[in-house]
């Protein structure tokens, strides 16, 4: 087994078997047969132990050369078969980019977003403009400029989220009314704007309250505006959101930033076949002190404002019993409203 002829025969047999292996499984069996522990080349290495010491070195070189030759043939064939396998996998798993894609079911847009966009479209069609403001506000814009007294309950921590440190006079806005002040300070008169955004109050999340809610607020400041203009705007808004038969009424109320002030109710046919008056929001003529705070002469200009919660509007308009459904992110809640309604 240690003769050059025997080693050459073993190497030739191994290389021939390796060359004929056409799969990785066959090649693995060939390796076991010709390079494994009981292969002729392995037995030749074991036979070195019984040779005389003076012959062992030369015979060892021949055995190692023979095994290395067989191993190189195996490694080359292994690389070739692996490359062929990988190429076949790429072809089998290839993607035809010209094929039409598999349709993914469309998700549902949140009904609050759809309602906000519909409100915006309604007022833009009336010639109004959209206005925005920051959610982190100062007491100056959220309370002071809106004629809130220093001891007004709304300023308390039981109603308002304040930003640390205590003397920063910053808070999460409790209404979108600060946008009124920022707009009047930044724009030329007349002003007709609608602002829609998130507001924050320290309410517990329950069936009718949420600490984060969306509010729509309208402001008009021009020469000669009156409560009649306010009523006409509210009626048009109500018909756009509740249908052509909807109508509004106002009841005296108090807000620091309007005088006179009123709460507005809306009458409409609801989703369960009935009709009734429902409290909708607040409104009134802009208080002269608010106009003065923005450098506007109340003897020359007047204005009106109104504000409604979108969650509440959606809740009683669509007969939603629990406001928590609007914030839990369950797509099953959004789907009945339609993808793009």
Swiss-Prot record:
<feature type="binding site">
    <location>
        <position position="259"/>
    </location>
    <ligand>
        <name>Mg(2+)</name>
    </ligand>
</feature>
<dbReference type="InterPro" id="IPR006195">
    <property type="entry name" value="aa-tRNA-synth_II"/>
</dbReference>
<keyword id="KW-0067">ATP-binding</keyword>
<dbReference type="Pfam" id="PF02912">
    <property type="entry name" value="Phe_tRNA-synt_N"/>
</dbReference>
<dbReference type="InterPro" id="IPR045864">
    <property type="entry name" value="aa-tRNA-synth_II/BPL/LPL"/>
</dbReference>
<comment type="similarity">
    <text>Belongs to the class-II aminoacyl-tRNA synthetase family. Phe-tRNA synthetase alpha subunit type 1 subfamily.</text>
</comment>
<keyword id="KW-0479">Metal-binding</keyword>
<dbReference type="Pfam" id="PF01409">
    <property type="entry name" value="tRNA-synt_2d"/>
</dbReference>
<keyword id="KW-0963">Cytoplasm</keyword>
<comment type="subunit">
    <text>Tetramer of two alpha and two beta subunits.</text>
</comment>
<dbReference type="InterPro" id="IPR022911">
    <property type="entry name" value="Phe_tRNA_ligase_alpha1_bac"/>
</dbReference>
<dbReference type="GO" id="GO:0000287">
    <property type="term" value="F:magnesium ion binding"/>
</dbReference>
<dbReference type="GO" id="GO:0005737">
    <property type="term" value="C:cytoplasm"/>
</dbReference>
<dbReference type="InterPro" id="IPR004188">
    <property type="entry name" value="Phe-tRNA_ligase_II_N"/>
</dbReference>
<keyword id="KW-0436">Ligase</keyword>
<keyword id="KW-0460">Magnesium</keyword>
<keyword id="KW-0030">Aminoacyl-tRNA synthetase</keyword>
<dbReference type="GO" id="GO:0004826">
    <property type="term" value="F:phenylalanine-tRNA ligase activity"/>
</dbReference>
<dbReference type="GO" id="GO:0005524">
    <property type="term" value="F:ATP binding"/>
</dbReference>
<keyword id="KW-0648">Protein biosynthesis</keyword>
<dbReference type="GO" id="GO:0006432">
    <property type="term" value="P:phenylalanyl-tRNA aminoacylation"/>
</dbReference>
<dbReference type="InterPro" id="IPR004529">
    <property type="entry name" value="Phe-tRNA-synth_IIc_asu"/>
</dbReference>
<dbReference type="GO" id="GO:0000049">
    <property type="term" value="F:tRNA binding"/>
</dbReference>
<dbReference type="InterPro" id="IPR010978">
    <property type="entry name" value="tRNA-bd_arm"/>
</dbReference>
<dbReference type="InterPro" id="IPR002319">
    <property type="entry name" value="Phenylalanyl-tRNA_Synthase"/>
</dbReference>
<protein>
    <recommendedName>
        <fullName>Phenylalanine--tRNA ligase alpha subunit</fullName>
        <ecNumber>6.1.1.20</ecNumber>
    </recommendedName>
</protein>
<keyword id="KW-0547">Nucleotide-binding</keyword>
């Amino acid at each position: 087994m240690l003769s050059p002829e025997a080693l050459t025969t073993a190497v030739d047999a191994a290389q021939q078997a390796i060359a004929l292996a056409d799969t990785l499984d066959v090649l693995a069996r060939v390796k076991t047969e010709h390079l494994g522990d009981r292969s002729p080349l392995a037995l030749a290495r074991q036979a070195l132990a019984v040779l005389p010491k003076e012959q062992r070195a030369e015979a060892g070189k021949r055995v190692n050369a023979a095994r290395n030759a067989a191993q190189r043939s195996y490694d080359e064939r292994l690389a070739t078969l692996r490359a062929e396998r990988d190429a076949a996998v790429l072809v089998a798993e290839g993607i035809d980019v010209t094929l039409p894609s598999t349709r993914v079911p469309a998700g549902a847009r949140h009904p609050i977003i759809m309602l906000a966009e519909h409100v915006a479209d309604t007022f833009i069609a009336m010639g109004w403009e959209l206005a925005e403001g920051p959610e982190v506000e100062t007491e100056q814009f959220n309370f002071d400029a809106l004629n809130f007294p220093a001891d007004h309950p709304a300023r308390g921590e039981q109603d308002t989220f304040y930003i640390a440190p205590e003397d920063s006079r910053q808070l999460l806005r409790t209404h979108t009314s600060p946008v009124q002040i920022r707009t009047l300070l930044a724009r030329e008169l007349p002003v007709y704007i609608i602002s829609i955004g998130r507001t924050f109050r320290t309410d517990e999340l329950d069936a009718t309250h949420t600490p984060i809610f969306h509010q729509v607020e309208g402001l008009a400041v021009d020469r000669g505006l009156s409560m009649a203009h306010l009523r006409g705007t509210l009626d048009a808004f109500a018909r756009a959101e509740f249908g052509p038969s909807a109508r509004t009424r106002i009841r005296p109320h108090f807000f620091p930033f309007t005088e006179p002030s009123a709460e507005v109710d809306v009458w409409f046919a609801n989703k369960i076949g009935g009709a009734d008056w429902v409290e909708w929001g607040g409104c009134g003529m802009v208080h002269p002190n608010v106009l003065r705070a923005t450098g506007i002469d109340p003897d020359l200009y007047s204005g009106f404002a109104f504000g409604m919660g979108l969650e509440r509007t959606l809740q009683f308009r669509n007969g939603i019993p629990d406001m928590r459904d609007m914030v839990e992110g369950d797509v099953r809640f959004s789907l009945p409203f339609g993808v793009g309604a």
